Amino acid sequence: IKPTNMRGVESAGMLCSGKELGLTEADYPGAEFNGIMILHEEHPLGQRIQDAVGMNDIIFDIELTPNRADCQSIIGICREAAAALGQKFREPVIRPVTGEGDASDYASVSVENTELCPRYSARVVTDLVIEPSPKWMQRRLRAVGMRPINNIVDITNYVLVEYGHPMHAFDLACVAQGHIIVRNARENETVVTLDGKERAVTPEMLLIADPEKGVGIAGVMGGENSEITAATKATLFEAAAFKGSNIRATTRKLRHVTDAAARFIKGVEPVNAYLALARAIELVDDLHAGKVIGEPIDVCAADVSPRVIDVDYAHVNKILNTDITPEDMVKMLATINIPSEVCGDKLRVDVPHYRTDIESGIEADWDIAEEVGRIYGYDNIPPTLMRGNTFRGRIGDDLKDEDAMKDLLVAQGCCEMYNLSLIHISE
């Protein structure tokens, strides 16, 4: 902005609206108001607008490969950054919070479909104090494009960003009998979600319900009939693991993808559900947002025992065209928090619970080769030409029959139509 002469008076500044500054409601409350933007606090003249609205942080825009669901979180990125910088990653220690009373006096959980919901963990908090979350939490949420709402909802979103595990908070008074039922939707059932839209659900979809009604679409969005409001006095925090393929099918039918659904689709570990819940309760206690009741309610049908795989390190070297000693492989894997040891002609690898991309069985050698290769450095691997036999292609009998049928129908006067495969069937 340069000094400008307006009506004979030199003006050295300008009063701007949030829109003129390129701000949205997620960046600063009231930024989308049609008029001059009003700051809610006193700020010294000459202060940078970035500092005044809390947008002075450094934001990293990171492109992830689809298989690394664990990196959709601050902690996941920190693990990778520590490995890249040669630093030891310090795993966050969650302070356990012991609640008073018995949670079963307030709530209960039953899971009817454990295949689609292998784990459902919940925690009751009463005597809620609903208020804006602290400035530091609001600032961090805005930095990642989330709009602060209140302390309880913000805690669930903060844990989502920090641990990469979606959470939800129900108004416990709106859950009939305090009983949560994880079940498939019924015929002709509808749910009004938090965005105010009535959505028709089908029996293939998983629903969070109480004995009377649906209170949320599992892994996608909570229901409007149980949302946290200023009048909420007790809440049930939910941290669950839902089957990614089912959530993907649900979002396609509903034509609606949320941040939570995107993470479930890529895969979340049942172990992480319990950690996320513990972190949320720790924040509730730190912010004095309510009274924690009893112990967690945990319905777990998943195998959460540590996963151990045996890897043929000679095969790893063959895949990479390298000659790395097994002892060096152990050291390389340790830099990315994957413990391992040499056992004869194998590497015995303890797979961290968050590394859902590392498979067991015949894929294990290839997955560990990928990890060893990126730590060793692909530039250090000697280039070689691809070797292999080529075969003459041929059209299969099924395709021949299909082409013959098409030719016959066209000869009879029919027209062949090619539809776009990426549009909804109704269009």
What are these regions (language model features)?
Residues 1-399, 403-410:
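RNA/tRNA-interacting regions in translation and RNA-turnover enzymes
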Residues 148, 416-421:
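Structured aminoacyl-transfer and RNA-binding surfaces used for tRNA recognition/handling
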Residues 187, 415-416:
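Glycine-rich anion/phosphate-binding loop at the beta-strand->alpha-helix junction
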Residues 421-427:
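Residue-level detector of conserved catalytic or cofactor/ligand-binding positions
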